């Protein structure tokens, strides 16, 4: 119950932001042409693929800052954040310029009607990295109320801007520009929260308790011998050697921290990028193979993939909780169970409606012209329910430092690509291929979580 109470406010904020986005999605479905809506769905899928690597930094931030807090090294956080922000800004600018130059080529490869919105989508994916950095700092500090507010800021600003820009005639480009601006506004809000809370000032906020003994991720703090007081004898050669050894240990620990952060971010980069592929490969491949089906399939895709977005919101609670408990030699199965329980509510509702009244729901939400993929609705809802569980399992495994999850996700993405591509753009066949892959992957990743937990219990 305690875990449920901790996750519920964040889940509520995420649900509010998601509900607002759903409302706008339904509205612009009626404002855009069928082909235009299909193109927007492809660009949104591209954004989520690009945002997953950016979110990898969030995982690395949470794990590394949690480890630094355990060994009373909050002094390292501010310098690292400043340096990382500088490098990230340079990369965002360069990537955005490259996106402008290549927007025509990318639009042609994706079989889009025009390059409109491509550069904005790519730039939004790059800026997401900055937002992920700041959200990671909020998560590592367990600042869940400001984090929940930040989700609402992003969601509501995206909604308002999308309606306004599409209404003035900017169409797909206006919708993608709204995504870019909402990410920028959310990052500004996160920066403001971090400044106000001052979470990582070592002179004001005490560090967390140290990790369990023998924790290789955080390292054990080394205490230097105190200098002699006035009148006391000068330390002998043995004491001087101890001082030198301490200095070398500190430098070694700092180097270990940098290497560990690089590995954490690299692992999360691969894992979350693969989750992005698994989430959107069906939309991209179907739209490329059969553009005439893209709009109708996008309608069911938008509805079902809200479950994945809900899982990502819940991961904002699960990730820091699992990382913190891992450093204490404990598991976070109660927190994982709480997030799965919350996720089960919208999943059950969507599965019920998509099975018994798919065409009616799509007709009310999107209009009669986007109901052609209704027979695939329930199947895709089941597939995305499985993927949502995989998202939670993956974040749990990343939080406890299990890097083999990348190979499982890579295998799943490869299987999904082959199976979906072989369906040649048929909505029902595409959804079935997706379900086969996602169900198998959820089972394997869930088993991995249980294996890791049993192993940690035996060790402890």
Question: What is the predicted function of each stretch?
Answer:
Residues 1-20, 190-194, 206-215, 219-268, ...:
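N-terminal membrane topogenesis motif
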Residues 44-55, 268, 275, 287, ...:
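Transmembrane helix-bundle signature of multi-pass secondary active exporters and lipid flippases
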Residues 82-110, 164, 337-366, 375, ...:
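Alpha-helical transmembrane segments of multi-pass membrane transport and lipid-handling proteins
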Residues 55-71, 140, 300-328, 399:
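Helix-loop junctions and terminal segments of transmembrane helices
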Residues 34, 103-121, 291-294, 355-385:
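Interfacial segments at transmembrane-helix termini and the short loops linking adjacent helices
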Residues 128-149, 382-408:
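Membrane-interface junctions at transmembrane-helix termini in multi-pass inner-membrane proteins
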Residues 2-59, 96, 266-289:
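Signature of the first transmembrane helix
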Residues 115-122, 148-200, 428-453:
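Hydrophobic alpha-helical transmembrane segments
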């Amino acid at each position: 119950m305690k875990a449920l109470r901790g996750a519920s406010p964040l889940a509520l904020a995420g649900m509010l932001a998601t509900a607002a986005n759903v409302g706008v999605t339904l509205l612009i479905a009626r404002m855009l042409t069928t082909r235009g809506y299909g193109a927007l769905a492809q660009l949104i899928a591209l954004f989520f693929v690009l945002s997953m690597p950016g979110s990898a930094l969030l995982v690395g931030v949470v794990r590394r800052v949690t480890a630094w807090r355990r060994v009373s090294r909050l002094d390292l956080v501010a310098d690292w954040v400043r340096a990382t922000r500088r490098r990230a800004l340079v990369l965002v600018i360069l990537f955005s310029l490259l996106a402008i130059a290549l927007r025509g080529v990318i639009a042609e490869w994706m079989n889009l009607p025009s390059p409109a919105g491509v550069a904005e989508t790519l730039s939004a994916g790059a800026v997401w990295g900055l937002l992920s950095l700041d959200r990671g700092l909020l998560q590592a500090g367990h600042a869940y109320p400001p984090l929940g507010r930040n989700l609402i800021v992003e969601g509501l600003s995206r909604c308002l801007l999308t309606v306004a820009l599409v209404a003035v005639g900017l169409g797909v480009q206006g919708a993608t520009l709204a995504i870019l601006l909402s990410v920028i506004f959310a990052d500004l809000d996160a920066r403001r929260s971090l400044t106000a809370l001052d979470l990582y000032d070592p002179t004001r906020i005490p560090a967390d308790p140290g990790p369990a003994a023998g924790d290789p991720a955080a390292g054990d703090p080394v205490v230097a011998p105190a200098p002699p007081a006035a009148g006391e004898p000068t330390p002998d050669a043995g004491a001087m050697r101890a001082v030198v050894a301490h200095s070398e240990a500190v430098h070694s620990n700092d180097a270990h921290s940098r290497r560990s952060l690089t590995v954490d971010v690299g692992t999360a980069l691969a894992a979350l990028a693969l989750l992005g592929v698994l989430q959107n490969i069906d939309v991209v491949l179907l739209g490329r193979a059969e553009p005439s089906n893209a709009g109708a399939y996008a309608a069911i895709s938008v509805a079902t993939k809200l479950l994945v977005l809900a899982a990502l919101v819940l991961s904002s609670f699960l990730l820091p909780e699992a990382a913190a408990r891992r450093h204490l030699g404990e598991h976070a199965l109660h927190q994982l169970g709480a997030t799965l329980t919350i996720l089960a509510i919208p999943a059950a509702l969507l599965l019920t409606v998509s099975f018994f009244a798919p065409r009616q729901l799509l007709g009310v939400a999107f209009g009669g012209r986007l109901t052609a993929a209704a027979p695939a609705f329930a199947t895709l809802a089941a597939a995305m329910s499985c993927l949502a569980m995989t998202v939670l399992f993956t974040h749990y495994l990343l939080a406890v430092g299990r890097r083999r999850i990348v190979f499982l996700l890579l295998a799943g993405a490869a299987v999904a690509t082959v199976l979906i591509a072989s369906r040649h753009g048929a909505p029902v066949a595409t959804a079935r291929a997706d379900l086969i892959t996602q169900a198998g992957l959820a089972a394997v990743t869930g088993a991995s979580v249980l294996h890791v937990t049993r192993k940690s219990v035996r060790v402890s």
